């Protein structure tokens, strides 16, 4: 018969000690110097040994201003240096796989619809292409073709079942008629990750901060919007169609230097032909943007008020605009293409984008 060895007392003691709660550590909160000393000691106990003290890392991460340095000259796919850089705020959403096409490009701005059940475990998230299908559902083939060329073709290739998207917003027609759809749809930042599944997908966006990949090592993600739904307001004011950067003309009144940063906006308008999403970029201030948008939409506004008679007080709202974030006005934006199943959609790409979503503001 084999005799079992004696019990390892050291291992038994270590296991029992692991069941006991850790000893409490007192922090002096009456004096600032002693509080700093106690916190420094607490951090050093739980931090790994390195060439830089734990207190220095803690102080640099919380007190030093964040600075972002991009390697690669502003081109997509560059890596970020970690000197004083603060990580972005990511948002995770669980959505139905049938409502989101896995071919959607990373960097696509996403919008969450939330109306009745704030505690639902499954979210309703739309892309610019799926919103295009939702807004043109039920208008007929002629109306959809009139709304856009390549955008119509690509949207119908990606989302060939408009009824699936319409089920996510069952009272879409009433919300548009009452001019209240923008109250329930919220920009949630550009797409940076999509974990595919059979029934449910988990997608991740950058709600606030630099738009980078969630996986480490971090890499920049280019924001991508359809070119047919994009307007450069600075170029529109000057009568041209060029990219960002340089100087701006103000209605022919002369030259003005552009600020270092430009902003990307999204506008939801309730036009006579139906609701429409449009992206704008400009380096001008907030008040100027609102006035410029009223001038830009003035033909549609006057047409609607002249055709629709009589107007109900709840039908006076023409649209709303929200800011999606900022980017370098010097680098500006560039044209590219999104390819899918032999079709190509002209898109606009923006590098080094900083997601900073604002609330909707009524244009008129």
UniProtKB/Swiss-Prot annotation:
Record's InterPro entries? Herpes_1
GO aspect biological process, one term? viral capsid assembly
Q: Which UniProt keywords apply?
A: Capsid protein, Host nucleus, Virion
* Assembly information from the UniProt record: Interacts with TRX2, MCP and capsid vertex component 2/CVC2.
Chain's role: Structural component of the T=16 icosahedral capsid. The capsid is composed of pentamers and hexamers of major capsid protein/MCP, which are linked together by heterotrimers called triplexes. These triplexes are formed by a single molecule of triplex protein 1/TRX1 and two copies of triplex protein 2/TRX2. Additionally, TRX1 is required for efficient transport of TRX2 to the nucleus, which is the site of capsid assembly.
Describe the family membership recorded for this protein in Swiss-Prot or TrEMBL. Belongs to the herpesviridae TRX1 protein family.
Q: What is this protein called?
A: Triplex capsid protein 1
Traced from the root, the source organism's taxonomic lineage reads: Viruses, Duplodnaviria, Heunggongvirae, Peploviricota, Herviviricetes
Gene for this chain: TRX1
């Amino acid at each position: 018969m084999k005799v079992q060895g004696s019990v390892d007392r050291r291992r038994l003691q270590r296991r029992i000690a692991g069941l006991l709660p850790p000893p409490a550590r007192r922090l002096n909160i009456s004096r600032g110097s002693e509080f700093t000393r106690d916190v420094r000691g607490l951090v050093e106990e739980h931090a790994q040994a390195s060439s830089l003290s734990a207190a220095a890392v803690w102080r640099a991460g919380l007190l030093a201003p964040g600075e972002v340095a991009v390697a690669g000259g502003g081109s997509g796919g560059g890596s970020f240096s970690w000197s004083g850089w603060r990580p972005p705020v990511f948002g995770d959403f669980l959505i139905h796989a049938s409502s989101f096409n896995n071919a959607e490009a990373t960097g696509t701005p996403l919008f969450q619809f939330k109306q009745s059940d704030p505690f639902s475990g499954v979210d309703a998230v739309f892309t610019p292409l799926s919103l295009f299908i939702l807004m043109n559902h039920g208008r007929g083939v002629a109306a959809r073709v009139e709304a856009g060329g390549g955008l119509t073709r690509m949207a119908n290739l990606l989302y060939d079942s408009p009824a699936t998207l319409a089920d996510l917003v069952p009272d879409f027609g009433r919300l548009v008629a009452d001019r209240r759809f923008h109250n329930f749809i919220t920009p949630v930042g550009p797409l940076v990750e999509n974990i595919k599944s059979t029934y449910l997908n988990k997608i991740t966006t950058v709600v606030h901060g630099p738009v980078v990949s969630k996986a480490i090592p971090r890499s920049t993600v280019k924001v991508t919007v359809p070119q047919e739904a994009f307007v450069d307001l600075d170029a529109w004011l000057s009568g041209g169609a060029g990219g960002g950067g340089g100087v701006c003309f103000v209605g022919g009144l002369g030259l003005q230097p552009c600020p270092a940063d430009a902003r990307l906006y999204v506008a939801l308008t309730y036009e006579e032909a139906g609701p429409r999403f449009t992206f704008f970029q400009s380096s001008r201030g907030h008040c100027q943007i609102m006035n410029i948008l009223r001038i830009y939409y003035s033909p549609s506004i006057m047409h609607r008020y002249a055709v629709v008679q009589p107007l109900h007080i709840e039908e006076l709202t023409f649209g709303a605009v929200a800011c999606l974030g900022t980017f370098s006005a010097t680098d500006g934006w560039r044209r590219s293409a999104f390819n899918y199943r032999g079709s190509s959609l002209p898109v606009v790409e923006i590098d080094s984008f900083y997601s900073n979503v604002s609330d909707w503001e009524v244009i008129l």
